[in-house]
Regions:
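Pore-lining transmembrane helices
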Residues: 1-352
Length: 352
């Protein structure tokens, strides 16, 4: 037993929640931001300005999300070079086969492949062959075995969302907003789920509100700890960056989730806020302002179809309030209550 412990220590294989659920998960979120999310922002900018070069550039970046996440995980696990480079293939396969659960599949599979690769690294005279073979075979093999089931499990969130859309507007607003918002922050793809469900209309509006509550909520309430960089990366990128901190203290998730439970029914019952653009926009929130652009293109389409007379000041006010103002104000209020209760403290929202 002592020999095993000595071997694991020598290989820097540390099997702890801190290493896997905080360090690896936090790094994975940064990898996602540096590929899918920044690519989405660039692509959206290109689409709105008519610059095809930006659309292409953004497309290349988003296509590399799996490899980027896997390499980020490998970096967090202190993988040697050959293991780290081999994770590019592992990340691609896990993300491609994982569907809506792609990020979660990458997390699980890349961790296993990383540790197996580290275990054999520099143990043979043909390390240049053995290490990549073990890392890639184990990672791609696991991807073929479990990535699709992980994706199917993540897609079950869609079943819950569809049930929620059948409820009364008040209840539907709360449930859809909270569920899609939570899915956006988790290492699964809320955008893929919404796209698969064709989530538009009033339910799409509630989903947009829920996603914005998470992203803007985390961005604004953590401004003191993360500054402008954190404000932009979370507000225009993803609240998934906070997953490592959520694992350490789940109570930091309460404020934005409560905010989404308020903005959702306001969207459905008060403002009749609809998202009639591409369904994928319902699960994007303020990432690259894709959610808001989806709402706007929906307005334009409705006008062209004759179902909407014009875009009114009330429409713009609803978007600004539901997507930016209320998520910021409500999350800060709830955050201060949590601080007074001693549930969260300085540094709990700090991003590395």
């Amino acid at each position: 037993m002592s020999n095993v412990k000595d071997f694991l220590k020598r290989k820097d294989i540390v099997i702890t929640p801190q290493r896997y659920l905080i360090e690896a998960l936090g790094a994975m979120a940064q990898g996602l931001f540096a590929s899918l999310l920044i690519g989405t922002i660039i692509k959206t900018l290109g689409q709105q300005t008519g610059l095809d070069v930006l659309v292409d550039l953004g497309g290349y970046a988003t296509a590399m999300s799996g490899p980027a996440m896997a390499c980020a995980i490998g970096w967090a696990l202190h993988c040697p070079p050959l293991v780290l480079f081999s994770l590019i293939t592992v990340g691609y396969s896990a993300n491609a086969l994982g569907g809506a659960g792609g990020p979660l599949a990458v997390l699980i599979i890349a961790i296993v492949a990383s540790e197996l690769g580290k275990a054999v690294s520099k143990e043979t005279r043909v390390d240049i062959l053995v290490t990549p073979l073990v890392t890639i075979f184990s990672g791609v093999g696991l991807s073929m075995l479990i990535a699709a089931p992980i994706g199917a499990a993540a897609s079950q969130v869609g079943t819950l969302i569809m049930w929620a859309t059948e409820q009364a507007p008040l209840v539907m607003g709360i449930l859809v907003s909270v569920i899609v918002g939570v899915a956006l922050t988790l290492p699964i793809s809320s955008a893929a789920i919404c796209a698969a469900l064709g989530l538009t209309g009033i339910a799409g509006g509630a989903a947009v509100a829920g996603c914005c509550a998470q992203m803007i909520g985390f961005a604004v309430r953590s401004y003191k700890e993360n500054g402008v960089g954190g404000l932009v990366s979370q507000g225009l990128g993803t609240s998934m960056l906070q997953m490592g901190n959520i694992v350490k203290n789940p109570r930091i998730w309460i404020a934005p989730t409560l905010a989404s439970a308020i903005t959702g029914p306001l969207a459905t019952c008060v403002f009749h806020f609809e998202m009639n653009g591409a369904a994928v926009s319902s699960g994007m929130g303020t990432c690259g302002l894709v959610g808001q652009i989806g709402v706007y293109t929906g307005w334009v389409s409705d006008i062209a179809a004759g179902t909407k007379a014009a875009i009114t000041p009330v429409d713009w006010a609803a978007m600004v309030l539901l997507c930016f103002v209320l998520p910021a104000v409500l999350s800060v209020i709830f955050c201060e209550i949590e601080r007074k209760l001693g549930w969260i403290k300085e540094g709990d929202l700090k991003l590395n």
